[in-house]
Each structure stands twice: as C-alpha cells, then as structure tokens.
C-alpha cells in the first residue's frame, strides 16, 4: 500500500448545487466521516464553495466522482507535508457567539473583559468555533442559559471539547464529552486544562461509555455530529435526558433538517427554536 498524498478538493457553484452535493457526501456509504466544509464564498455572485480533504485514494476518487456529477467547478491541490490544518486556521479571527469569545493564542492580547473567553487552538479535532454548526450551538446555549442553568451536560462528538468546556465555564456541575476519535479526546482534555474547565472526556461511539451511563440522566445534551448519526442516536439521546431536558442538535444541513427533526418529533420531542447559519441548521428540542 502506498502512502496517500494529501489533497484539497474545491468545488464551486450555485447554492442549490453545493448543498445537494454536500448532502450526497453525507449519504455516500464510502464517505462516512469525510472531512469537508461548505460556505458562501461570494454573496454578490451567489457562489458557494465546498472544501473536501480526502485521506485515502479511495476517498479521493469517490469525492471527485461525486462532485463531478454536479454543476460545480471542481479543482484540487496537493497539500504540503505539514500541519496544513493548523496553518490554515492559525490566522482565523476570534469568534463571538453570545457571551462566548473563542480565540487562538495569536489573539490572546485582545480579549474582551465582559465575555466568557475560551482558548481553542487549531489542530486535528473539529470545533474551533468558526464552523457554522459550532457557532450555532454556542448561540443556542447562550440563549438557553439566560433563563436557566444546566447542572449536568453531555457533549456527544465533542471534537475539541469546546461545547462541554463552555458548559463547565458557565455553571455546569458536571460536563462530560465523548468522541469516537481518540486524538480528539486527548485534545479535548488538553483544552479543558488550558481553559481551567472541570470537563471530562472519554472515548466512545455515541453514548456507549460507562462514565456516560453512570452520570445519566442529563439536563442538556449537545450533539454536533452528522445528520445520519443524529437520527440513529435519537432514542439513546432521549434515554440520556431527564424529562423536560434539552438537546441541541447540529452538524446538519438545512436540507437535512426535516428528516432529523422527524426522528425526534416521533419520540415526543418538541422544537424550542432553530438557528440557521450559512447552509447549516441548529435545532433545540425539549424531551417530553
């Protein structure tokens, strides 16, 4: 087996084509967990952009074939043998989401005095705060804690640990995060130490972990993952919540909102609010 040379695949086109292609990536059996982003690149011209980062020759070929089937201009570049993700994100501006201010070391000299400042460095884990889904979760959580506090919080698919850390920094007595990716769990633990947050992180597929089970039920569950896992985990999330508990769902495109929502409404959940940011949706629902 030969080593794969990292590539960045870029596809540009109209919003409908880009969103439909992104939805197809999510539902492609050979691209489960594929790393990509979708955003509006040029508002005036209505140009949307997908950036995909395959990790194998097979994933590369599948992405090129899939994206080539849409009315999109597709190109690709070879990435340098470096920590390209950190390089790409190191100059990103800080993000403000409600009371939360998410920043990297390069912005440590200009922190607002009236915000909850969370330092999250660029790296291999998802969730620096810049993605529309992460911002949506923070905005939704900020709105919720204006009315109440959540004592026990679970973050499914924690990535960098940002959401669990945000909960720990705003009054949660227990904040637990899970991730299927072991390096992400390590990064989450490091971020909790940096941010002086009493948050715990464990390696788990979904909610399948002893620590998660022992501390259930939770007042609030974050699940910022992908549409299909959100649907498949609906019953597990319901069991993990107290009656009347809240779940914040994200990682889904607007085009996937209806099917994700249906999985929870069929289990008695009620929609509290929803947030749209770029092509992404965040749903806040309450357990019966």
Curated annotation (Swiss-Prot):
Keywords recorded for this protein, A-Z: Cytoplasm, Methyltransferase, S-adenosyl-L-methionine, Transferase
The family this protein is said to belong to: Belongs to the methyltransferase superfamily. PrmA family.
Designated gene of the protein: prmA
InterPro entries: Ribosomal_L11_MeTrfase_PrmA, Ribosomal_PrmA_MeTrfase, SAM-dependent_MTases_sf
Ligand binding (S-adenosyl-L-methionine): 134, 157, 179, 224
Physiological role: Methylates ribosomal protein L11.
Enzyme class, UniProt record, top EC level: transferase
GO cellular component, one term: cytoplasm
Compartments it resides in: Cytoplasm
Organism for this UniProt entry: Caulobacter vibrioides (strain ATCC 19089 / CIP 103742 / CB 15) (Caulobacter crescentus)
EC number: 2.1.1.-
Protein name per the record: Ribosomal protein L11 methyltransferase
């Amino acid at each position: 087996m030969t080593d794969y040379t990292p590539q960045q695949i870029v596809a540009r086109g109209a919003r409908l084509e880009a969103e439909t292609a992104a939805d197809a990536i999510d539902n492609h059996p050979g691209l489960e967990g594929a790393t990509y982003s979708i955003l509006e690149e040029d508002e005036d011209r209505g140009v949307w952009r997908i950036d995909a980062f395959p990790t194998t020759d097979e994933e590369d070929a599948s992405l090129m074939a899939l994206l080539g089937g849409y009315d999109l201009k597709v190109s690709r570049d070879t990435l340098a043998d470096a920590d390209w993700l950190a390089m790409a994100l190191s100059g990103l501006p800080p993000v403000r989401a409600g009371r939360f201010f998410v920043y990297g070391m390069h912005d440590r000299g200009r922190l607002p005095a009236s915000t909850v400042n969370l330092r999250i460095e660029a790296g291999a884990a998802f969730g620096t705060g810049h993605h529309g889904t992460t911002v949506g979760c923070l905005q939704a959580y900020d709105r919720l804690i204006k009315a109440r506090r959540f004592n026990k919080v679970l973050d499914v698919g924690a990535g960098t640990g940002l959401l669990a850390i945000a909960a720990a920094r705003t009054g949660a007595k227990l904040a637990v995060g899970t991730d299927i990716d072991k390096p992400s769990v390590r990064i989450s633990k490091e971020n909790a130490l940096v941010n002086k947050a009493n948050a715990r992180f464990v390696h788990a597929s979904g909610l399948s972990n002893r620590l998660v089970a022992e501390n259930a039920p939770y007042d609030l569950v974050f699940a910022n993952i992908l549409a299909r896992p959100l649907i498949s985990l609906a019953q597990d999330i319901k069991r993990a919540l107290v009656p009347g508990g809240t779940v914040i769902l994200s990682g889904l495109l607007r085009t996937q909102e209806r099917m994700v929502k249906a999985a929870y409404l069929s289990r008695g959940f009620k929609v509290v609010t929803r947030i749209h940011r770029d092509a992404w949706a965040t749903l806040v629902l309450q357990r019966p």
